[in-house]
Amino acid sequence: MGYSYTEKKRIRKDFGKRSQVLNVPYLLTIQLDSFDKFIQRDPDGQQGLEAAFRSVFPIVSNNGSTELQYVSYKLGEPVFDVRECQIRGTTFAAPLRVKLRLVSYDKDAAPGTVKDIKEQDVYMGEIPLMTDNGTFVINGTERVIVSQLHRSPGVFFDSDKGKTHSSGKVLYNARIIPYRGSWLDFEFDPKDNLFARIDRRRKLPATIILRALNYTTEEILDLFFDKVVFEIQGDKLLMELVPERLRGETATFDIEAEGKVYVERGRRITARHIKALEKDGVKKVEVPTEYIIGKVAAKDYVDLESGEVICAANTEISLELLAKLAQAGYTAIEALFTNDLDFGPYISETLRVDPSCDRLSALVEIYRMMRPGEPPTKEAAEGLFDNLFFSQERYDLSAVGRMKFNRSLGIDSETGSGVLSKEDIVSVMKKLIDIRNGRGEVDDIDHLGNRRIRSVGEMAENQFRIGLVRVERAVKERLSLGDLDAVTPQDLINAKPISAAVREFFGSSQLSQFMDQNNPLSEVTHKRRISALGPGGLTRERAGFEVRDVHPTHYGRVCPIETPEGPNIGLINSLSVYARTNDYGFLETPYRKVVNGQVTEEIEYLSAIEEGKYIIAQANANLDDDFRFTDTFVTARGEHGESGLYRPEEIHYMDVSTQQVVSVAAALIPFLEHDDANRALMGANMQRQAVPTLRADKPLVGTGMEKPIALDSGVAVVAKRGGTIQYVDASRIVVKVNEDETIPGEAGIDIYNLIKYTRSNQNTCINQIPCVNLGEPVGRGEILADGPSTDLGELALGQNIRVAFMPWNGYNFEDSMLVSERVVQQDRFTTIHIQELSCVARDTKLGAEEITADIPNVGEAALSKLDESGIVYVGAEVKGGDILVGKVTPKGETQLTPEEKLLRAIFGEKASDVKDSSLRVPNGTSGTVIDVQVFTRDGVEKDKRALEIEEMQLKQAKKDLVEELEILEAGLFSRVRNLLVDGGISEKELDTMERAKWLEQTLSSESKQSRLEQLAEQYEELRKDFEHKLEVKRSKIIQGDDLAPGVQKVVKVYLAVKRQIQPGDKMAGRHGNKGVISKINPVEDMPYDENGRPVEIVLNPLGVPSRMNIGQILETHLGLAAKGIGEQINIMLKQKQDIEKLRGYIQKAYDLGGGSQVVDLNTFTDEEVLRLAENLRKGMPLATPVFDGADESEIKGLLELGGLPTSGQITLYDGRTGEKFERPVTVGYMYMLKLNHLVDDKMHARSTGSYSLVTQQPLGGKAQFGGQRFGEMEVWALEAYGAAYTLQEMLTVKSDDVNGRTKMYKNIVGGTHYMEPGTPESFNVIMKEIRSLGLNIDLDEA
């Protein structure tokens, strides 16, 4: 494989034995594709906005004389870009304009004669747009819409598994779930009658539904039963014989024909008997007359003369009835065929409990159940039933629902109507009865073929449709009012309901979540998350174990490892690396096709439904050079996901990759295969909580997934087109695009502006740092600048730390960690956190609040960091309690005495009627002010500071645009120069001439002249574009801000806090090995090796065996080897050894082991080898892909190559005494993360503060500035010690003795340290509670 210039800077050695068949797909596809389908630049009418409009329009008035038709829609351009929306706190959205046509028909002329047509563009609110990285900016914050895993529409057959009824009888049920509309359930009761429920209301006999569908009793029986025909011949009774029906029954009489006895009475009828009957062609058999008793008539028998019904359908036949029928001249009687085994009489029994007798009574019954208390009329009852399942407006199975419905019932076609038909309902009942009769299986609801993904686009479309339906009602009313001559479509449509529905969904839906922006991995994982919760989904409380459990169909679709711990376990999942959704919303995963035991390059995506039919081999099955299986038997997954051994020719597909099973986060854990699943779960979850460190450090031991995640997360800057770096500084990169990638007639310059020190959602710091140098070539899609937690385009969440597994004076008891002071000094885990504090000046009833430096009763020192406008300077170092923005609020006028009024009038003292409400730094916080923004309402005069900021922004914007213009001009003029030199004008002449004049030259060649004219036009275009951009930018900066009602001004102050690591901070590895720092130890006290090199962190060896996460030990060994090789390269570089020797050593390292990666350093120039060596000095990065990683021999080989002991253990010496430790210790390099659980955020202290209203006890928690709870057990502890006075203090003055604590405070202030405890408030509360129960208690002094 050839490496590009950028890739050659640092190559990660890959231990993977299998070459990558399929590259990791773009990780945010699920979000971006879904939203693209919703917005659809060229609508197809099947989905998205277009489908929503078409489903609601045209809206016809009640009398049919006018209709409002939909023509097309257009999304405008958003006013502000993403960055501006974040700063201003607005939503990144585009206006939606819809072209509508109002058509009036002539009432007097023939139907359909058009009288008038009005067409108009109507504004229908704003649609939030998705950013390039799959997020939405709503009110200035980035949010993610999580995809939902919900039950697919269709029909499901299930059973209660014998849990409902005390007898343990299994009751079966069927449920038809539409995409929207009423649910229809059928269920058996313990007596085997079949009932129906609509929308989970009370049950009705299922035959009521059939009667409402206009079936008669005879037709119903005909649908569900086979018939038995009895013939009356004189006093004999013959039965038509179908031998197969007799199988398994016991003969109650001799079965004989033509004198031959086939089965004697009392014998069980077997297959041998049936064969004999069939062979002799026995068609009829004589039965005793009693045999017909209890059989059920299949149709009505009427007296042909009188017309009287002798025997109605579904009536049990008795001897009297038989005699009557014979008398009436009937020679053949049809009865229902039922038996106890596999043809139950369920429908027949249900008809007996059915109160209705015809269609109307059935409809009335349904109406009464759906609308209790309303008097039913025929029209209302019919309308209700029709609307329930047969109306396009009210009921929609959707394409998915119809496909699942037809597949479940074995109908060939996958398409059909969105509403139910008579046949559909009958087919569901038939299948349910078949299952009850023992034919057919119930469905597995947790199978991923029965659960589908609803992504952003689909959910937004549903919300939009809800808004449209609300509008439709209003428009219908308006159309029916008449007098439409002067009305335009704009007058009819009120866009508020639509924008309200959309806003509600994006702003406050359970699935619209505040983006987890801790680091690039947490962003990617959040966008790939799949939740079973949310509207139309499950709730935590109701979800059982089955739903949460790993299902065989999760393989390759949903990660079995990554899911939260706690109440949401198993309900929130993560998409596997290669998974995607198909058109129906079911998850698919890719497989390589296998033909006759040979694995092909062809890749097919299979959904869980299709996968069940095939046998699929694992990705680690052994193949020869012709891609044939080498083993006689191959481990593979058969039907139902069960694993087994199969012959190669039986196999249909093979997995694409070993990491296909797991999610992105789990695929980042090296040696995942050696970790216990519970710990791997913690490891995957904790990587998302890693805080980006000051300097990112790539992991020495990775898995090869680091690059795709960093690129796809969008935090790094990636080249849109290939070219050469023309200019680079901390905030901008300019690329001169390659000739073959430029569009004719453009300057061929790409400018990338970098994000500097911005706040993320989690208050971590987002900063981009260029990683290219001037003049370097870059290819398309290559990395230009690293974002937070990325290092040369690879994800770098933590730091490579030298660790030792050994106990050290109890400082690593219970997972604590002992950290060397050097880690703190080198700022390895120092992080920057940025806080946004805002101050809002509102209009109050007593007057406007004012932002000012003139604050009453505040000393000069407190105002030292404020400017004249009362706003803190950028760069000021502030600590808890400092004023950031001075603000005063008008106080209510107190009643003044006449004397005070006189003094006020004379001296005009106004200062006393305002109170200080300034924005101060929260307690316990300190930092540096890095930015201040002032937003002023339109029409309110801007203060000096706001004008300064505005001027600065204008200057910066102009400077940026001018620089951009200069760069583009330079690119353009270099082309002009080349053209003119080609055209015969000397370079000297050009150098003396002004550049603008170059464009006025005339060239002899006509083609060159036209090219020059083209370039001149381009130059004009550039200037115009520059003017336009500058004007737009200027107007955006100058215009007032759209603030909330009643808000005059908002000031936002950004504080940056640098946090070093300290005892109490939480750290973790990638294998679920988490712990808290117990002590920061001086370097000289840390254990050191023979070379005098101390370790940086000491971990407890007891944390490994019981947790079974051995991956961390292997990582430590491999990390040591990686570092060892880096050391060897470093020595060679320092000694300035021969480049060939260096090349040979590095080549040896890359060639070691049986990996599929090929790195040929002979194709590298000496300069490239040196640059590679320079980047490998600190250690050679290694990749050990999950389930396909380095084995023991490779680790040992690498350790040997690095000149290290192959045991991975080293003799250590005690830093304090210099004594050798008793035995060798495992030492190596582990990738450690600092998690976002910092002791600074948790630490909290209180002396006095707020109290709860009823109990008068201090509140709890840091956010409420609460106290420490002294609970029941703590009271026992003090009782056990007999510390009576301490206990009294705890229960009274320190808690809820109101008077006592006030006196105590006064005493402390006065310097007399004694307390006077009184009655605790909670005692009064309990007294009141007892009185509220009607028991009076009086307290008498003893």
Swiss-Prot record:
Coiled coil: none
GO biological process, one term: DNA-templated transcription
SUPFAM superfamilies in the record: beta and beta-prime subunits of DNA dependent RNA-polymerase
E.C. no: 2.7.7.6
Catalysed reactions, as listed in the record: RNA(n) + a ribonucleoside 5'-triphosphate = RNA(n+1) + diphosphate
Gene Ontology CC, one term: DNA-directed RNA polymerase complex
Domain of life: Bacteria
Keyword annotations: DNA-directed RNA polymerase, Nucleotidyltransferase, Transcription, Transferase
GO MF: DNA binding; DNA-directed RNA polymerase activity; ribonucleoside binding
InterPro entries: DNA-dir_RNA_pol_bsu_external_1, DNA-dir_RNA_pol_su2, DNA-dir_RNAP_su2_dom, DNA-dir_RNAP_su2_hyb_sf, RNA_pol_bsu_bac, RNA_pol_bsu_CS, RNA_pol_bsu_protrusion, RNA_pol_Rpb2_2
Homology family: Belongs to the RNA polymerase beta chain family.
Oligomer and partners: The RNAP catalytic core consists of 2 alpha, 1 beta, 1 beta' and 1 omega subunit. When a sigma factor is associated with the core the holoenzyme is formed, which can initiate transcription.
Described function: DNA-dependent RNA polymerase catalyzes the transcription of DNA into RNA using the four ribonucleoside triphosphates as substrates.
Protein name: DNA-directed RNA polymerase subunit beta
Organism of derivation: Actinobacillus succinogenes (strain ATCC 55618 / DSM 22257 / CCUG 43843 / 130Z)
Gene field: rpoB
